[in-house]
């Protein structure tokens, strides 16, 4: 998507995808963010998939995805948007984070969605968009040798049939607490990919009041469900108590922490844990 988000799984989504059962009928991400794991799916192999649920507690994320469902209108409205423009970038940030407004989930706001995409696509990967600065030349050079900014790359996906397939597959967009969305969609044929704010990194996220009691509430909701889940975390001691390795499948993978990345310096390594009830 070319949109950066705190804790996003753009780098390891393919690894996670390999553990998702392909006989599911409903796919849900209770903490969808930029929905990277879904975008890594090879959807044609999921023959029984009928329902795809995007859910996030952050109204800015939800509004963005409501607007992306009408990708043609989104693309048309961005045609005159200048790229890597510091003045516009700072204005978008101010309009989003220094100005009070209310988003109506029944009436998507394309102006806000475009400003949000403009900021997310042009901050350093994993940076809090409220605090991030414009990254000049943060895009990529294509095979033709022509440079494209990340906002241009994002915009190009709005007219790409490959991406239309993903946008069209999203059937439900919710702005619910994770426990509500789990209860609403849980069934024996539902799969939940859960990527919550990680333990002791919760303050990086917008609109997340996520203390240890909330982590435990999530654990209890997952353990009580009928469906299948995969849960991403960094390791902390309570995970061993909540999800003992004798009862749950654990996998791990080393990766570069984009949220701690600094231009010009080697990226910090971390170990991603994936816990499954199957």
Region annotations inferred by a language model:
Residues 1-32, 36-37:
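S-adenosyl-L-methionine
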Residues 1-15, 70-193, 197-203:
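SAM-dependent nucleic-acid methyltransferase catalytic core
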Residues 10, 34-37, 58-60, 122-125, ...:
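Short, solvent-exposed loop/turn segments at secondary-structure junctions
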Residues 23-98, 143:
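SAM cofactor-binding core of SAM-dependent methyltransferases
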Residues 23-27, 49-52, 167-172, 223-229:
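Short active-site oxyanion
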Residues 30-31, 55-56, 174-176, 194-196, ...:
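Short His-Asn-centered micro-motif
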Residues 52-54, 172-173, 247-252:
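Conserved beta-strand scaffold positions in the cores of enzyme catalytic domains, especially
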Residues 207, 211-278:
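Long, positively charged, glycine-interspersed low-complexity recognition regions
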């Amino acid at each position: 998507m070319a949109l950066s988000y705190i804790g996003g799984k753009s780098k390891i989504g393919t690894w996670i995808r390999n553990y998702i059962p392909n006989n599911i009928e409903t796919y849900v991400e209770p903490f969808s963010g930029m929905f990277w794991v879904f975008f890594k799916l090879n959807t044609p192999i999921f023959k029984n998939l009928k329902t795809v649920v995007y859910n996030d507690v952050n109204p800015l994320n939800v509004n963005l995805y409501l607007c992306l469902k009408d990708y043609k209108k989104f693309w048309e409205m961005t045609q005159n948007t200048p790229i890597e423009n510091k003045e516009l970038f700072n204005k978008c940030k101010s309009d989003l984070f220094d100005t009070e407004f209310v988003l109506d989930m029944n009436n998507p706001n394309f102006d806000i969605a475009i400003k949000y995409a403009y900021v997310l696509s042009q901050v350093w990967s994993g940076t809090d968009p409220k605090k991030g600065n414009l990254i000049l030349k943060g895009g990529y050079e294509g095979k033709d040798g022509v440079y494209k900014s990340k906002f241009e790359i994002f915009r190009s996906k709005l007219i790409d049939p490959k991406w239309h397939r993903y946008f069209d597959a999203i059937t439900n967009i919710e702005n619910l607490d994770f426990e509500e969305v789990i209860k609403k969609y849980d069934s024996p044929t539902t799969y939940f990919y859960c990527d919550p704010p990680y333990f002791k990194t919760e303050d990086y996220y917008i609109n997340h009041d996520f203390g240890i009691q909330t982590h435990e509430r999530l654990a209890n909701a997952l353990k009580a469900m009928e469906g299948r889940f995969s849960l991403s975390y960094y390791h902390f001691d309570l995970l061993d108590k909540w999800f003992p390795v004798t009862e749950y499948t654990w996998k791990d993978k080393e990766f570069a922490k984009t949220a701690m990345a600094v231009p010009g310096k080697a990226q910090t390594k971390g170990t991603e844990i994936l816990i499954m009830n199957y």
